[in-house]
Structures are given as structure tokens and as C-alpha cells.
């Protein structure tokens, strides 16, 4: 399955068709928030074909480290401020705020749910595996890395903070960035945590054929079953 470069826009429409209000974030380093430095200051000068001009997260991540922060932390702040904005609209049911993210967006949603209790459920696509199987052994965007994280926890261990909120994980069996064995190991650990929290029925893993990309039909269908609508 080829990377669907328009999945964010279509996710908006999918959510609205299901009766949800939808807000899409322009993530730092992407789209209108991409790196706008002159070309001679950027990595493309070494290999013009090495970087998608619309995905420029590396420099922002490095500058965040220079400032004693992380790009992931900055993105979490953006997401929390977006929820603040949603909460200012009286027609929004703040008891039913959910996050849907694919790849880096899914990673962001997972970490954000650990510090943002207003996120009441998650759909994560193409992002769920152990550190060792994914970012520890396969080249990834540098903003996926948290300094020192593995000293304290692995990616699925964060379920201890997220549970018992509804969780749907949708992965491709042939995703080169998140190998299947690492996905299955991670989900077993997360599910065990949900079981310990008395919420085994509130998490689900869906494995699809193909590689890296979002699967809306499977994702939304499973999520509707978990949240009842």
C-alpha cells in the first residue's frame, strides 16, 4: 500500500460523516509549518532527492534539543492547546474528545494521551511497536525519539497511563518501519495492561495487508464498536 498523502484531509471528512466535529492540526515540520530556510541551509543540498519538501521535521527537532526541549513535547503542547480551543465552543462535547493519528500523528496521540486526560479515546495507525523493533533498529524521523526514554519504559508500557480509555491500533503486516513481530509484542504488552485495569474489551489490534498507511474503514469501524457510536 502506497503512503496516502491525503489521509489527513479525508480523515476530517470521515469523522464529520460519522457525526463528529473534526479539527486537524498542521504538525510542526509539515505542510504550512515546514522548514522555510533557504535551500543552501538545508540537507537537500547534499541530495536533492533525499527529502520530501513538505516533510521537514529534522531541523525543528534538532533546534528543540538545542533549547532543552523535544519536538515531540512541542507537538504535544500544540495538541493540548487545540483541545483548549475546542473546549471554547459550547457545541463541542468535551467529554468525547478523541485523537486519530497515523505514523507520527499516531505517535503524537499516544504520548499526548499520557498527559492530557481530556483525550477520551485513540485511533493509532502505523506507529505501534516496541522501541527495539522500530525506532531502535530502523531509521525514523528524529522527532520520534525521547532522550533516555528506554531507561524507564517501552512504547507499549504507556498503556498504563492511557488505560482504560478506548484504543484502536491499526497496522500493516508489511510495514517496513514497524515490523510485525515488534507490533505483536507491543500489543500483547499493552493488552496485558488493559486486562490488569479491567478494560480488556477497550483495546483492539487490527492487522491489515500492506505497508505503511492509514486504513480508515477498519479503524473507524472498530472504534465505533468500542465507543458505541
Task: Kindly give the residue locations of the regions a language model identified.
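Short glycine-enriched nucleophile-adjacent loop
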Residues: 86, 106-117
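Active-site loop->helix "elbow" adjoining a glycine-rich segment at hydrolase catalytic centers
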Residues: 71, 103-106
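Short beta-strand/loop motif that positions the catalytic acidic residue
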Residues: 162, 169-171
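Cap/lid segment of the alpha/beta-hydrolase catalytic domain
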Residues: 1-80, 133-138
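Mobile cap/lid helix-loop segments that gate and shape the active-site cleft of serine hydrolases
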Residues: 58-69, 76-82, 96, 119-160, ...
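Alpha/beta-hydrolase fold nucleophile elbow
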Residues: 86, 90-103
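Acidic catalytic loop of the alpha/beta-hydrolase fold
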Residues: 173-178, 213-214
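C-terminal catalytic histidine-bearing segment of alpha/beta-hydrolase fold enzymes
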Residues: 188, 194-229
